[in-house]
Amino acid sequence: MEPEAAAGARKARGRGCHCPGDAPWRPPPPRGPESPAPWRPWIQTPGDAELTRTGRPLEPRADQHTFGSKGAFGFQHPVRVYLPMSKRQEYLRSSGEQVLASFPVQATIDFYDDESTESASEAEEPEEGPPPLHLLPQEVGGRQENGPGGKGRDQGINQGQRSSGGGDHWGEGPLPQGVSSRGGKCSSSK
């Protein structure tokens, strides 16, 4: 092919294909460690700022769906749906799934404190939940006899197991027959 024909073919190909190698006036996209930070839709670019300021994009031929971080419905990402803390239990039961299913874009539900939650929590007494992990059941019971030095001090941590079957130090189950939790020797033969 002649050089002039090759140049014409390259021009024609450049119109149909937008590969970086076909368009010498555009630099190829950066690759490797010198490339800029990855695109994050929640960070505004200069083009997004212009769109927000003037109401129209910098390029008149830009498509709404491909320009900037606004979605097809005009939402700025990430989208957060705010619900009051008083509605948290209702959300956990059923409505949260329905809210997210009916929302047109990917969203995150954030709960915020509302006044009804504060007044309700002040009126209620604190609920007694399970004991903290670092406390032994004897300490939670509050009985002096099971406290340090009391008559219940020789019992295992797991109150359901008595000295006949014993229990290992963490209450994980009975020890093998003849094994003492005090470190004594086993009288059975192996």
From Swiss-Prot:
**GO CC terms:** nucleus
Annotated region (Disordered), positions in chain: 1-72, 110-190
The record's note on quaternary structure and interaction partners says: Interacts with TBX1.
The signal peptide here is: none
Taxonomic classification: Eukaryota, Metazoa, Chordata, Craniata, Vertebrata
Write down what this protein is called. Protein ripply3
Q: Which InterPro entries match?
A: Ripply_fam
Which organism does this record belong to?
Homo sapiens (Human)
Kindly indicate whether the keyword Transmembrane helix belongs to this entry. Answer: no
What function does the entry list?
Acts as a transcriptional corepressor. Negative regulator of the transcriptional activity of TBX1. Plays a role in the development of the pharyngeal apparatus and derivatives.
Where it mainly occurs, coarsely classed, is nucleus
- Give its localization: Nucleus
Copy the domain comment: The Ripply homology domain and the WRPW motif are both necessary for its transcriptional corepressor activity on the transcription activator TBX1.
Q: Where is the composition biased (Pro residues)?
A: 25-39
Region ranges (Ripply homology domain) = 77-112
Cysteine pairs forming cystine bridges in this chain are none
